[in-house]
């Protein structure tokens, strides 16, 4: 998993509340267990028309936001079913940070496991970030995980809280496998001792 230290990029405003995981990645994309290639399915029912052409009104199809790295979203983002494909799709599209007032619990946990930083902020701070994001090509935000702050294009800052353990994992690029490998020396030592006591 890639480390998350400081992220600077365009922020796309998605002013929709209760975006569920079915909307993030529709069911027809759930047949794969690969984490790559799902970006094309991200918000596909909103990004594409029935004939397969792009919907120019959807934010991620607009030129300024095609390469967005940050998503500023309405309340209760990622609610619904527990599909881990939702953060996979966001990550494959290039989004590494989602900012909202609240998240679905399972989606929130899955983000951390996949190198995405979900940030909870107050409604007042979210409104401020929406204003920043709506600047289009000038909608660059900087997310500094070490200092736990979001810096806007005018230099304004928004502070956020994060669990210290999850912060450690993101800063060091540690997923569940990485956390296990951190204990490799202890595991090897334990297994060696077991081998010496095969009768036990």
From Swiss-Prot:
Entry keyword set: Amino-acid biosynthesis, Branched-chain amino acid biosynthesis, Leucine biosynthesis, Lyase
Biological function: Catalyzes the isomerization between 2-isopropylmalate and 3-isopropylmalate, via the formation of 2-isopropylmaleate.
Gene Ontology terms: biological process: L-leucine biosynthetic process
Catalytic reaction equation(s): (2R,3S)-3-isopropylmalate = (2S)-2-isopropylmalate
Enzyme kind, highest EC tier: lyase
Family matches, as Pfam families: Aconitase_C (PF00694)
Assembly and binders: Heterodimer of LeuC and LeuD.
Enzyme Commission number(s) of this protein: 4.2.1.33
Protein name: 3-isopropylmalate dehydratase small subunit
Molecular function as annotated in GO: 3-isopropylmalate dehydratase activity
Family to which this protein belongs: Belongs to the LeuD family. LeuD type 1 subfamily.
Pathway where it operates: Amino-acid biosynthesis; L-leucine biosynthesis; L-leucine from 3-methyl-2-oxobutanoate: step 2/4
CDD domains: IPMI_Swivel (cd01577)
InterPro entries in UniProt: 3-IsopropMal_deHydase_ssu, Aconitase/3IPM_dehydase_swvl, AconitaseA/IPMdHydase_ssu_swvl, IPMI_Swivel, LeuD
Gene3D superfamilies with a match to the protein in the record: Aconitase, domain 4
A single GO cellular-component term on record: 3-isopropylmalate dehydratase complex
